[in-house]
């Protein structure tokens, strides 16, 4: 594998000098040769510097890097998250074929289907009004309380599928900052509000602090006995849930082989199911399952997650591009970049290999983005003319849900196509100067101004095109990126499924709380922390 990486690196200088405009001019088939599809989902990577030779090397890299072998280990329930001694089976949650999936010799599918059925029954009860609040009124608002994977996925997907909402209004609280829950509680009435507390252990500080605030909100307005009518939980800590006052019939579990950032397919998706209904939630799972099958069965050169991961590895570890921009041209996907940020950076932001040695080269990139066209008026300047090359990944649906606003969607499409073309083509000095002189600027001034209007071009982008942002399409898109992260993680030779980097700060925060409360001295901490504690204490009222 290292030899192939070195071969790829030897092509890097030539690749960086590649004139994509010339490549398209010389090859009328470039688009068809460097794009792949899964049903209506098209992935165009022709505007990257990948050519036939590089693609062959990347395929060889996947083969010799053991990606296919590791893929089958994941799907078959092997313990690939070895630092936590866990299988990695979020794919079982959307296994619509019901083919047995074994963990320690036991088929997990009966339990998966039982939880899914219980979720559906509960969601239908809330949606229909059969499950009422303590005063007999139907639930009109559902507030999900969680953080990280218990929040980002449901928030993103619920917003993305807004056209399919026909249930109660959905709200989300994550931040321990009291302003977050305070602002949400102003929008609802206690007698018609249901809270879902999502915490596997029921000990997550942010979640349980907000849950206690929510409990006080209900108890103060409706009495202690009302709590059981206004809460549900997604957790495996039944004793703690019962102590909180939540009926066991309203508790939905999941398993230690489901990582938080991969948990939207599990009971963590309950607020989404309540919003869009069990049938549409099933279609969401169907879309992901279709990608799972494609990932396992399609040859590498036709395999969307494989190719996306290979190109991502090439950009990060060969061309050494430090970031990637996620740019969905769909306002309802406005939280998708943040969702992928956690998925990618928490998975592949590692500095140690599976052998316990330092990573050679780079691991995962910084992932960020905003929906188009908003980003065009914010940070695209740097993507087009900055000194760093930032690979861009565009997403656009051919059809929107507002036929009366068709012209606006056509404007959206024209913008995303223009951005990918502009990044590829750029604008030369001669073209910039001619544009100025054609407008009447004299030659000398045009020579001075033109450099500021030059675009180097050759800036890589991938574009995804699909029919419409349905539950099926969203499930497919999420699973595509999940498997992309997996492919890159295997090639980085890291464990993509733990997150020890989250722990140290949490441990230190626990120790600092008594200091902030004034119960202990800050003397044992560094001078900066002592100074900050003193400054905050002085300002506190």
UniProtKB/Swiss-Prot annotation:
Its EC number is 5.3.1.9. It catalyses: alpha-D-glucose 6-phosphate = beta-D-fructose 6-phosphate. GO terms for biological process: gluconeogenesis; glucose 6-phosphate metabolic process; glycolytic process. The keyword Membrane does not apply. The active site is at 346 (proton donor), 377, 506. InterPro entries: G6P_Isomerase (IPR001672), G6P_Isomerase_C (IPR023096), Phosphoglucose_isomerase_CS (IPR018189), SIS_dom_sf (IPR046348), SIS_PGI_1 (IPR035476), SIS_PGI_2 (IPR035482). Catalyzes the reversible isomerization of glucose-6-phosphate to fructose-6-phosphate. This is Glucose-6-phosphate isomerase. It comes from Rhizobium leguminosarum bv. trifolii (strain WSM2304).
């Amino acid at each position: 594998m290292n030899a192939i990486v070195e071969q790829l690196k030897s092509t890097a200088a030539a690749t960086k000098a590649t004139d994509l405009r010339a490549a398209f001019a010389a090859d009328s088939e470039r688009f068809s040769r460097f794009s792949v599809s899964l049903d209506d989902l098209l992935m165009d990577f022709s505007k990257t510097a990948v050519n036939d030779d590089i693609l062959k090397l990347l395929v060889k890299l996947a083969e010799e890097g053991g990606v296919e072998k590791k893929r089958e280990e994941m799907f078959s329930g092997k313990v690939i998250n070895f630092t936590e001694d866990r299988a990695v089976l979020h794919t079982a949650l959307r296994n619509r074929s019901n083919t047995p999936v074994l963990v320690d010799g036991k088929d997990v599918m009966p339990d998966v289907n039982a939880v899914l059925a219980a979720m559906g029954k509960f969601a239908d009860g809330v949606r229909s009004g059969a499950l009422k609040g303590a005063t007999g009124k139907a639930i009109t608002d559902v507030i999900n309380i969680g953080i990280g994977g218990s929040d980002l996925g449901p928030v993103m997907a619920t917003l993305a599928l807004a056209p399919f909402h026909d249930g109660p209004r959905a709200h989300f609280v994550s931040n321990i900052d009291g302003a977050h829950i305070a602002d949400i509680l102003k929008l609802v009435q206690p007698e018609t509000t249901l809270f879902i507390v999502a915490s596997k252990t029921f000990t997550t500080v942010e979640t349980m602090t907000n849950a206690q605030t929510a409990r006080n909100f209900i108890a103060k307005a409706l009495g202690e006995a009302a709590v059981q009518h206004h809460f549900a939980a997604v957790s495996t800590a039944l004793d703690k849930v019962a102590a909180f006052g939540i009926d066991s019939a309203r508790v939905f579990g999941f398993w230690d082989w489901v990582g938080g950032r991969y948990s939207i397919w599990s009971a963590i998706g309950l607020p989404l199911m309540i919003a869009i209904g069990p049938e549409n939630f099933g279609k969401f799972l169907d879309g992901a399952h279709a990608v799972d099958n494609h990932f396992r069965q399609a040859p590498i050169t036709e395999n969307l997650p494989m190719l996306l991961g290979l190109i991502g590895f090439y950009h990060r570890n060969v061309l050494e591009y430090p970031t990637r921009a996620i740019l969905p041209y769909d306002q309802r996907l406005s939280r998708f970049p943040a969702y992928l940020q956690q998925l990618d950076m928490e998975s592949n932001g590692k500095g140690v290999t599976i052998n316990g040695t330092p990573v050679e080269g780079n691991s995962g990139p910084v992932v960020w983005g905003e929906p188009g066209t908003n980003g065009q008026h914010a940070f695209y300047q740097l993507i087009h003319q900055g000194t760093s090359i930032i690979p861009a990944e565009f997403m656009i649906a051919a059809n929107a849900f507002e036929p009366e606003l068709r012209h606006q969607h056509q404007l959206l499409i024209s913008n995303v196509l223009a951005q990918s073309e502009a990044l590829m083509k750029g604008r030369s000095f001669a073209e910039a100067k001619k544009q100025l002189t054609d407008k009447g600027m004299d030659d000398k001034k045009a020579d001075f101004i033109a450099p500021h209007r030059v675009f180097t071009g050759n800036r890589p982008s991938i574009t995804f095109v699909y029919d419409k942002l349905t539950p099926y399409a969203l499930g497919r898109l999420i699973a595509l990126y999940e498997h992309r992260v997996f492919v890159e993680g295997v090639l980085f030779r890291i464990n993509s499924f733990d997150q020890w980097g989250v722990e140290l700060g949490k441990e230190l925060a626990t120790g600092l709380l008594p200091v902030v409360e004034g119960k202990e001295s800050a003397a044992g901490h560094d001078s900066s922390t002592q100074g900050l504690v003193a400054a905050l204490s002085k300002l506190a009222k």
